[in-house]
Curated annotation (Swiss-Prot):
Residues 1-17 form the signal peptide. Keywords: Signal. InterPro entries: LCL2 (IPR034543). Probable component of the endoplasmic reticulum-associated degradation (ERAD) pathway. Belongs to the LCL2 family. It comes from the Eukaryota. CDD domains: LCL2-like. This is Long chronological lifespan protein 2. One of its GO terms (biological process) is ERAD pathway.
Amino acid sequence: MIGNIAYILFTLTVVSANLFDFIQNQFQGNNQQAQRQTPGEYENANLNSGCSKYLCPDTSICVDEPKFCPCPYPSSQLRCFLPNGRYVCISKPAGEVSLNYADPKTNWKIDAKDDNIRDCGWVGRAWKGLV
């Protein structure tokens, strides 16, 4: 008897979760489809952006130079500069040390000097083959 009740509750939970997802995707439009562009549309939007300086490829933001391009998700990413003048965006470290990386003006300067913490210092060491 208890097994049957548990089975029924489990089945109802799974069915209701799937139904909720279906309804949410159908009636809220699942915004992701509206944001998708074909390669031609993307190229056309970038070519007609009106940017007279440098258009960042990841964010379509107009900046003075490529080194000023922001990461696509600045609240959760660090922009780390490479020795060749380019940059790479990586996820900010999590856990207890995450507060050290809250300020985007200084977070790229921090090096925890710990290969278990992936920050810009780690990227520099990896570039040199030290990791």
